[in-house]
Amino acid sequence: MSEATLDHAVAALTDGSKVRIPFWHIDSGRPGEKFMVLAAQHGNEVQGCEAIRRFKEVCERELVAGSVHLVPFANLPAVRHRRSHISLGPEQPYGDDEGHNMNRTWPGKAHGNDTERLSYALNEAVARHCTRCLDLHSWSRFTATATLARLDGGLSEQMARVAGIRFIQWRKPPTGSNDGTTIGALFNDSGRGSITIELAPQWVIRENEVSLGLRAATNLAKLFGMIGGEIEQIDPTWSSAGRMTMRRCASTNSRRPARGCSWRPDSRPRST
């Protein structure tokens, strides 16, 4: 067994206070990938927090190569504030982020706004040392859990195909500056490999979605040779190159998209 070590990324905020963001580090003692799993970049997206806690227990029992770095509360002030961003007040919509959408601030700035400082602290303490990343979210515009990944023949595509999530939404690589980007783009643009999973919806923790997040993290660890055993797959998977189509074509109780939507069976072979 490999015992988890609790550590903290320390962010110095603009008012002079400090935030200690907790993360677990589990090292197998053998060479291998350094796998980062994080959740709650937005403070009301908490399903991934429980998935990470359970994945920690799996890794403590079964990790045979490499190391994992588990961040259950990436945006700890927003989690405490019960808002998507630390800048939001009551009834303010998600879009009023004013530069505080954490997943648009990577790799962060040492002397930026408070959210940029949180990202900077996590990047320095965890992300820049890791080779693979799973970013767990809970966007309520998805009514079924879905993977977001790059369809580029690279690591992101490979990871998406083995995660064990029924729906995959393919996205093109971003264009333009890397100054203030998603953590997924930060990893993928540097050749390290990342996917995002939306464990819908927000505000709640549900057994089904937590189980899906745990399965995805475990499958990825198996893909990377960090945990033994067969990858647990589902059949079929459905994919789409569109955006914002999940609302009208999928539900948590359906086994296939609704008639007329843009989701199609994914026919490409999976990596194992």
Predicted feature descriptions by range:
Residues 1-272:
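Structured catalytic-domain cores with a bias toward divalent-metal coordination
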